[in-house]
Regions:
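Structured, solvent-exposed acidic/aromatic patches
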Residues: 1-168
Length: 169
């Protein structure tokens, strides 16, 4: 709750961060990245590891924490954690879509690499690889494999927060 509260109070609900960065600031935090971080944090909190099924039941804090006692991890399941996580994920997704982010979905991407349909990846177990459905599936597999390296300037509007290796930043 502390991380989520801090993100809400200091980052998301203030005007410190913009929704998108210009090219020269690519890789720096945005409000969309903060919302995604909040959603990921709440997903972790809702997961079985931290929501009633912690593996080490005798793991305790040596010093009592105000409001929590000696327990570091909740041993009781709380369905509301999943509700909060779902709401945060929906908010982050909608904010990203509203800001212009979208999944890169160009199934003809393979052509930009000079490949022909018969050179698309072979998928073991695919019953009819050259049927319309089979080709669409093979194109999607190719897209998922290689589009992650496609730059924003080339039309990949999927990046929300990335690490850059530019020495100037």
């Amino acid at each position: 709750d502390w991380i989520v509260k801090l993100l809400d109070e200091k980052v998301i609900n203030n005007d410190y961060l913009c929704d998108m960065r210009p090219d020269e600031e690519f890789g720096r935090a945005t409000r969309i990245a903060a919302k995604a971080l909040k959603a990921r944090t709440l997903l972790y909190a809702a997961s079985p590891l931290w929501n009633g099924s912690f593996t080490y039941s005798n793991w305790k804090n040596k010093v009592e924490t105000p409001g929590y006692g000696y327990e570091l991890v909740s041993k009781t399941y709380d369905r509301n954690k999943w509700v909060r996580a779902q709401q945060a994920c929906s908010e982050a997704l909608q904010a990203a879509l509203d800001a212009g982010y979208k999944l890169y979905n160009d199934l003809e991407f393979y052509k930009s690499n000079g490949l022909k349909e018969n050179e698309l990846p072979d998928i073991p177990g695919l019953a009819e690889p050259n049927s319309e459905e089979g080709l669409t599936f093979r194109k999607r597999v190719f897209l998922m494999r290689y589009a992650v390296t496609l730059e924003y300037a080339s039309g990949n509007n999927e990046y929300i927060w990335v690490a850059t290796k530019n020495d100037d930043l």
